[in-house]
């Protein structure tokens, strides 16, 4: 994952010191892009161990259109716990916008599948999670926003677009805000997997995953962890195997995915900025 290490180095060397909503402080750059050829292996960071279970279940949760953390908790995934209200609700976050835009019957994922199958040259194959009408009020708590019909958090990975050429499906993600140490490795793997899933159900080979950033930052309390990670040598990328029998994007289950030859360095703990 040279691309990811290059991003870390770029921010350390070129980043500006900036404050942020959480009060933690960051080193940040504005505008950066990485590209991953999915035929060269699954882009799962190897210089620290990632929790694949969380990545897969979160993606399946998005695709279900779910916005309550109960499904995640039932499957041992805790990455959204800090932002949910007492009932486990997060308000109209990613899954709601993907599957039920603005509370209307606009299923962006179904529309993408239809376009990929029937109009693959379309330049309108985008999914947006950025909905200004439900952005949270930063002056109140996460739970108050949810009670007011707003999202607990605004989407960081805001929208993505698909592109078909030469029988291959590629995806580009625009991420407006990126916690490079903790969040970005998850985001890379999640959208690479989504691209592979879409390719399978729509009859394409997986092409490239392109990851474009707005504000890409390293939190000030992650600097030691980043230096440790950069001291490690990246290892060969693993291979993601997907059950070839699944032909509907909404039919995937956790058991349909097998990651082979993943040999990462040990995990590196760090605090999430809340």
UniProtKB/Swiss-Prot annotation:
Tell me, in one coarse class, where this protein mainly resides.
cytoplasm
Question: Which stretches are annotated as coiled coil?
Answer: none
Q: Where does dUMP bind?
A: 21, 123-124, 176-179, 187, 217-219
The family database entries (Pfam families) matched by this protein are listed as: Thymidylat_synt (PF00303)
Q: Which domain of life is it from?
A: Bacteria
Signal peptide start-end? none
Catalytic residues per the record?
156 (nucleophile)
Catalyzed reactions per annotation: dUMP + (6R)-5,10-methylene-5,6,7,8-tetrahydrofolate = 7,8-dihydrofolate + dTMP
Record InterPro entries: Thymidate_synth/dCMP_Mease, Thymidate_synth/dCMP_Mease_dom, Thymidate_synth/dCMP_Mease_sf, Thymidylate_synthase
- Which key words are in the record? Cytoplasm, Methyltransferase, Nucleotide biosynthesis, Transferase
Q: Where is it localised?
A: Cytoplasm
The pathway noted for it is: Pyrimidine metabolism; dTTP biosynthesis
Specify which residues bind (6R)-5,10-methylene-5,6,7,8-tetrahydrofolate according to the UniProt entry for this protein: 51, 179, 273
Functional description taken from the UniProt entry: Catalyzes the reductive methylation of 2'-deoxyuridine-5'-monophosphate (dUMP) to 2'-deoxythymidine-5'-monophosphate (dTMP) while utilizing 5,10-methylenetetrahydrofolate (mTHF) as the methyl donor and reductant in the reaction, yielding dihydrofolate (DHF) as a by-product. This enzymatic reaction provides an intracellular de novo source of dTMP, an essential precursor for DNA biosynthesis.
| The protein's name in its UniProt record | Thymidylate synthase
The gene from which this protein is expressed is: thyA
């Amino acid at each position: 994952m040279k691309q990811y290490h290059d991003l870390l180095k770029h921010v350390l060397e070129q980043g500006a010191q900036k404050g942020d909503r959480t009060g933690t402080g960051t080193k940040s750059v504005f505008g950066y892009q990485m590209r991953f050829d999915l035929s060269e292996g699954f882009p799962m960071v190897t210089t620290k161990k990632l929790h694949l279970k969380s990545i897969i279940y979160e993606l399946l949760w998005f695709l279900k259109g779910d916005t309550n953390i109960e499904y995640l908790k039932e499957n041992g995934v805790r990455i959204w716990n800090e932002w949910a209200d007492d009932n486990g609700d997060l308000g109209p976050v990613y899954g709601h916008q993907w599957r039920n835009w603005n509370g209307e019957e606009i299923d962006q994922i179904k529309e993408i599948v239809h376009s990929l199958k029937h109009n693959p040259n379309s330049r309108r194959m985008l999914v947006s999670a950025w909905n200004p009408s439900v952005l949270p009020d930063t002056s109140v708590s996460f739970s108050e926003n949810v009670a007011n019909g707003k999202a607990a958090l605004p989407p960081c990975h805001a929208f993505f677009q698909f592109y078909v050429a030469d029988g291959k499906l590629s995806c580009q993600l625009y991420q407006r805000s990126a916690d490079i140490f903790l969040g970005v490795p998850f985001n890379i793997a999640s959208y690479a997997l989504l691209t592979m899933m879409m390719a399978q159900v729509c009859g394409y080979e997986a092409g490239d995953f392109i990851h474009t950033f707005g504000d890409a930052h390293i939190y000030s309390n992650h600097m030691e962890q980043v230096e440790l990670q950069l001291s490690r040598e990246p290892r060969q990328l693993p291979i993601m195997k997907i059950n070839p029998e699944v032909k509907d994007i909404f039919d995937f289950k956790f058991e349909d995915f097998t990651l082979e030859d993943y040999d990462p360095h040990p995990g590196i703990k760090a605090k999430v900025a809340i």
